[in-house]
Amino acid sequence: MCGICGTLHFDPAYQVQESEVRRMAHPIIHRGPDDEGFYLNNNIGLGFRRLSIIDLHSGHQPLTNEDGTIWIIFNGEIYNFKELRKDLEAKGHRFKTHTDTETIVHLYEEYGTDCVKKLRGMFGFAIWDDRHKKLFCARDRFGIKPFFYYLDGSRFLFGSEIKNILQADDVSREIDIHVMDYYLTYGYTPIDETIYKKIKKLEPAHTLEIKAGGEPVIKRYWDINFEPDDSISEDEWCELIENKLKESIEMRMVSDVPLGAFLSGGIDSSSVVALMSQFSEQPIKTFSIGFKEAAFNELPYARDVAAMYKTDHHEKIVEPESIELLPKLVSAYDEPFADSSAIPTYYVSKFAREYVTVVLSGDGGDELFAGYDHYPMAHKIQKYNMLPDAISKNVFGALHRAIPAKVKGKGITYYLSRPKDSVSAYISKFHQTEREKLYKPNFWNAIKNNPSESYKEEILRAGSSKDLIFQMQELDMRTWLVDDILTKVDRVSMQNSLEARVPILDHEFAELSFKIPTKYKLKGKSTKYILKKAMRKYLPDSILFHKKQGFGVPLKLWFKSDLNDYMNDRLMSKNSPLYEFLEPTYVKKIIHDHQTGMRDFNFKIWTLLFLDEWLNQQPKS
């Protein structure tokens, strides 16, 4: 695992200096503390930071082919590289290292830009093709590894993190207010944009080619495609799931440095640990985070799995003082990011790094197997989408207004009163009607004709399936999974120089899941039914069927107690940069309603706190 960056100047006479690229690479030493390397050739410069995982002594980058015409910088892991290498050697290619990186160089020589279709792994890389004077960049299918870029009239800049690009001279830091609206709606920035108007993300499963002075050519090389196969029985699906997940996990246990696993006690991480134990003669090192608040603490479940498989188990408790981490989190993410589970993810990553360099995680199971609460909710909403909009709005709107705030079930009436955007509304931090009150008039007027909800509604309409659950899964994979879950884990794990591998998001395993009918994913009251059944020979029902807790933080309680003063000092300050955009009276109402117990607004409060800190960290003009 590594960090990459680079610059391509459009003036062919321009000479890139090592100091330029070194300055871009310096802020991501955490991604690669073991080595650095640079390639300079007139108007192209590539920078690299290495975290040594495979072939510890000969994995220096940038790495080239035999005649020095193809150069690569690579961040990630290719798990089928040995198989690919054999095929390439049979075609006459000669290798000088044992790294997966070199395999990509020869694949590019042999297959050109189609080389990415043969890769099984996680990656963000850039190849300089000196013969054709072009830069070829790619990102893995699910976006496990990041790739950012910046384009102006004179150059193309790129990096594993936004901070790489911000180190270059004269990079615009203009804030994109539409992206800020998207952040306040969903808690993260969208798949191809960033909070900075001119800095973009290369989307998952896409490649980018650019020559000096030209426009980037961006292409998709893989896609999510749900094609349910009803010819396969329930038991056959279980066997297919077990075998393919085993294969994926075994591939990801190849490492020349110590390796372990995150263990939350949920079905996904527990399944990963259970299957890892089938391939290791030594106890698996497992790492868990807990809280003193019982409702948020899954440590008892993690301990049960650790005891069952005799793992070398390690635990840590997170307390309210962890709020002191906020400035460091803002620096790690480079842009607003409102998932508070970044706090325990940071601590478990830092904790694990004391023992290992690589961990396997259970991320992706909820998206592939319909594990979130909103999947059953979507079924309920779908029943009422058959009603005319006017009836839904009038009947359920009136019901929503009549029900007191504390009454259970009030929320569902809101979503049913807005059937067309109920899916987006359900997963919003601030709904559209709330944002109209929260935003100052100039901010609201600038975005009201293109609100953030329309972005996800377009994805739903363009989905590959008419099945609502498949649509929801696809929406989650194209937004929440990449922009929240995978972003969260990548930034804070790499902040601690820890590589996190994601076996459930192996693309071949994912393609298998795309064929499983909805009836096997949601059955009765059970989400992820078919995965639970497939894992029953490895895990007890107490693990498989206990109530889903997620990786939440007890902010609801902390904001009423230990963090009450902190919250008020930050958000009620007249000097808060929030109030260039937001109405102080509405923020005050949010805090009041939370403190008095009228509503649980901990997600909204954390969203505002993170944005407040991010704005405070911006250079003053």
Which residue ranges define each predicted feature?
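Adenosyl-5′-phosphate
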Residues: 1-4, 167, 198-204, 214-215, ...
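Cysteine-centered catalytic environments shared across enzyme families
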Residues: 1-333, 345, 349, 542, ...
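Short beta-alpha connecting loops at secondary-structure transitions
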Residues: 165, 288-289, 335, 379-387
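Conserved structured core elements
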Residues: 235, 239, 243, 270, ...
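Alpha-helix capping and helix-loop boundary segments enriched in small/acidic/polar residues
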Residues: 293, 317, 336-339, 386, ...
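Short low-complexity, flexible loop/linker segments enriched in glycine and/or proline
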Residues: 329-332, 353, 375-377, 558-560
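PAPS-dependent sulfotransferase catalytic domain
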Residues: 332, 346, 350-354, 430, ...
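Active-site adenylate/phosphate-handling loop in enzymes that bind or generate adenylated species
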Residues: 347-406, 480, 485, 489-509
